[in-house]
Amino acid sequence: MAVPARTCGASWPGPVRTARPWPGRGPRPCPDPRGPASGPARPLLLLLPPLLLLPLLTAPGASAYSFPQQHTMQHWARRLEQEIDGVMRIFGGVQQLREIYKDNRNLFDVQENEPQKLVEKVAGDIESLLDRKVQALKRLADAAENFQKAHRWQDNIKEEDIMYYDAKADAELDDPESEDMERGSKTSALRLDFIEEPNFKNKVNYSYTAVQIPTDIYKGSTVILNELNWTEALENVFIENRRQDPTLLWQVFGSATGVTRYYPATPWRAPKKIDLYDVRRRPWYIQGASSPKDMVIIVDVSGSVSGLTLKLMKTSVCEMLDTLSDDDYVNVASFNEKAQPVSCFTHLVQANVRNKKVFKEAVQGMVAKGTTGYKAGFEYAFDQLQNSNITRANCNKMIMMFTDGGEDRVQDVFEKYNWPNRTVRVFTFSVGQHNYDVTPLQWMACTNKGYYFEIPSIGAIRINTQEYLDVLGRPMVLAGKDAKQVQWTNVYEDALGLGLVVTGTLPVFNLTQDGPGDKKNQLILGVMGIDVALNDIKRLTPNYTLGANGYVFAIDLNGYVLLHPNLKPQITNFREPVTLDFLDAELEDENKEEIRRSMIDGDKGHKQIRTLVKSLDERYIDEVIRNYTWVPIRSTNYSLGLVLPPYSTYYLQANLSDQILQVKLPISKLKDFEFLLPSSFESEGHVFIAPREYCKDLNASDNNTEFLKNFIELMEKVTPDSKQCNNFLLHNLILDTGITQQLVERVWRDQDLNTYSLLAVFAATDGGITRVFPNKAAEDWTENPEPFNASFYRRSLDNRGYIFKPPHQDSLLRPLELENDTVGVLVSTAVELSLGRRTLRPAVVGVKLDLEAWAEKFKVLASNRTHQDQPQKQCGPSSHCEMDCEVNNEDLLCVLIDDGGFLVLSNQNHQWDQVGRFFSEVDANLMLALYNNSFYTRKESYDYQAACAPQPPGNLGAAPRGVFVPTIADFLNLAWWTSAAAWSLFQQLLYGLIYHSWFQADPAEAEGSPETRESSCVMKQTQYYFGSVNASYNAIIDCGNCSRLFHAQRLTNTNLLFVVAEKPLCSQCEVGRLLQKETHCPADGPEQCELVQRPRYRTGPHICFDYNATEDTSDCGRGASFPPSLGVLVSLQLLLLLGLPPRPQPQIHSFTPSRRL
């Protein structure tokens, strides 16, 4: 019988689908099915009503068999559902475990998590912790100002007059080519003994402070020696602070001269290469030294700016960008006759890490041409700063102009935009070696409350691109006590190895009189800082009473997370803060945007939302219900949130009887403790215990067997009410040990696992116990021993029914090894316990299926046999039969796919070793059909904390921060020779002996060779999850003469999709694969140019000091130059070039003449 042709748009009862005529029968008006996988239309499939899938539609080459009818496949699905449910009822022991809990009701209490009370208590505890650090900060800042005020400046001070511990001395003394070894150290350097201190993750000495001085600052200068002299008195204040608060970590004074004095003393963690650390460029120092900034950088790219000068400008702009933090806003433009932005950003944008990277890359593309037009550059900059339609800092406003010089003062522009109020500061930078008159540049800066700087060579860049902060600090200093505001930073990596920290900062002012009369000094002395480790804040949050899927988080005014379980940067750069937005830490939706805004505004709130969450292994998406509760943390810029699933409203707390507690016996004598001993494993199953901090003296270990051994040894000495142990954790562990042992006794021990092809049965609990039976199955158990960190545990709690988890397979790895019957599929389900009106889920139970045996069972259940022992039905030429998954596995593909799109079971023997792979890697054509028919939907997100393999080497070495490799054109350029000669004279004469090692080429950065280390990057993630289709569907994959019929149906009470399809007969059905594997994003995630058009809500610090009527702007920079003798310089340059060894360009560092305070 011929099947009537159907035109596009034909429909049948149920969801309407775009259809095509049966292949080869009638017109083909539909679009090409091999088009894009996504888009507004999905014309790939023809869905047919069940009545049309008649036995007459036979598969080619199998005339006696037809594609199974829908009711047949639904029957197979029911058989699969019944088999799974039966095995789980017998072996899972859900009902029996409920009864065990109720039988032991006297051993535990049910406690309630009250979100509002919890979050307010934690916020109060964090506030108290930070307040203690604030008090210590204030004592330090006050003391520092008094010490400096009382200090008498010494012009004739010598190095040997100063005793201090040089934090880099030990490393330098080990290096025979170090600065001190080469010139002979004149300092009276202290040599200290150190003790290991776990709290600091370092060796420390509590009796002294340590001093770190940047490599490019001369230790013996008068300014530095005087700084060391007066700051020595801080040592006693540091020590007293620690006496009052033993929990204090690093206490640091960062001086405006570049000196860092910190307590307790510890050797500097200098890399083997050059140490580029300068406290003045650290995020916490910059935040404490000035108020937020709106900055426009304009760069002269006229024709006179070429060669070395243009390269100096590019490097200077990049260094300037590094002085900005997330509270600042910036744009960069180039100008000649006209001005234009260097990047895609057309207005001020937040100076976050990703935006600054866009600027830095764009700056490298600047080309010199045309004539200088200061007017165009300044008008563009003022227009940018006057744009009120965008988010910005709304505090300090400034223009930074880099040029090689010019005659125009553009007074008319300043009169129009900036005078008489002069709300915008203008900083001018004369770049390169030239003979231009710099008076106009000085005038621009001096008449607009700015400063004039000269950058004649590479060595002057770092110091001269950061000293503008001293000018911005003037209003803060003049404001006096009003400006004494403690600020808390973003999260960043501690330079001394403490890990992730936040720092409280307080500016330190110069209280001395400046000059004759009562003129007040305007200079900032530096910034005082105290670190707080994130781990110390985390300890104040409830960990295990919130359940596996409950957590506490905190954000700042930028929306960046301070605390969050997903804040786990794999690579950290100590120069930049760790900035993970709350909406990037979770899967973004409108509800979370509202929560984030409310928290930034400092409001309280509570909201229950339905949202998507990513599984711990980042392979699955679940739709869940979460309760969010949040409050501000007083006296800080942080806000605290609590997230609880409804089933975590209650939790169990073990209640060991008073009689046992009064005995004062070791815990090892308690009832049920014997079931933790390895001697019981053979009969009771293997026990894994979560590696939690049960007691202070418990030695941690990544090996669970070793950890269990350490735990048992300690329990031989500890009593149940010991003060050194966490009784909640300890008692719940003992309780769950006994509970799970009774499950073995009542259910598992009497069952024959082999009968049902099971490799193991298991139970995991909130108390931290994972019991696997039989004991031998533990050898192949690969799940995390901490249930709260096990994906199967967390997903089972969030989903009802049976959750299948196939073994994880990466497409790049070799297929599964099926030998020795050790490969299994986990099936787990949560145990829901109702006690009165209180419902909770304290445990998860499950089985581990033998993959190969269940693959055979799967074929039988999806066949025309009623049971396994029945012979296969034979279908002769004269009779008509439906195909099934057992007899016709050469023509019919039958698979079970989980809700993430991963293969669980197949009737194809050659696919057994592909179990656990994303199904698109197994059958791309069929997976695309399932996606296009809404059986699956997908969620794309970005991982901003990923680590990527090193990129192929390009321009490596320490050179990016300042080494210019001259071209042939530069050698022929007289200006380059003059510049290079002048710098070489300065560099060689002053530092040739001191820093000899710098002139030895080393193709590595200061932190180590980029060829051998991973770098931080952004990865795009795609997860698939079940779509809106719950019914049983039949469809056809239309691809010319090779169309395929398929049927798909969700299995009730599981996370499985049952799919039956014709096997593809030719390559015409080949289509592009859907990708699930994480992929690298070269552009650092979503297009930044588009994102800045939709900026996320934020607010800056609530304080701003950008103006003071008493500010003295007369100190605005004065240029100085000397007329070079060209003959002498060229001769000297030739001599120096000939004297250098034939090696790559040296790493050049600068001498920085410091100013007297």
Swiss-Prot record:
Pfam families in UniProt: VGCC_alpha2, VWA, VWA_N
Disulfides per UniProt: C446-C1104
Tissue: In heart, it is highly expressed in atrium and at lower level in ventricle.
Main location, first listed in the record: membrane
A cellular-component GO term for this protein: presynaptic active zone membrane
Gene3D superfamilies membership: PAS domain (3.30.450.20), von Willebrand factor, type A domain (3.40.50.410)
Binding site for a divalent metal cation: D300, S302, S304
Molecular function (Gene Ontology), one example: voltage-gated calcium channel activity
Post-translational modification: N-glycosylated. May be proteolytically processed into subunits alpha-2-2 and delta-2 that are disulfide-linked. It is however unclear whether such cleavage really takes place in vivo and has a functional role.
Subcellular location: Membrane
Topological domain spans for side Extracellular: 19-1119
Domain VWFA: 294-472
Transmembrane segments: 1120-1140
Domain named Cache: residues: 488-577
Bias (Pro residues) ranges: 24-34
Family recorded in the similarity comment: Belongs to the calcium channel subunit alpha-2/delta family.
Protein name: Voltage-dependent calcium channel subunit alpha-2/delta-2
Organism, scientific name: Rattus norvegicus (Rat)
Gene: Cacna2d2
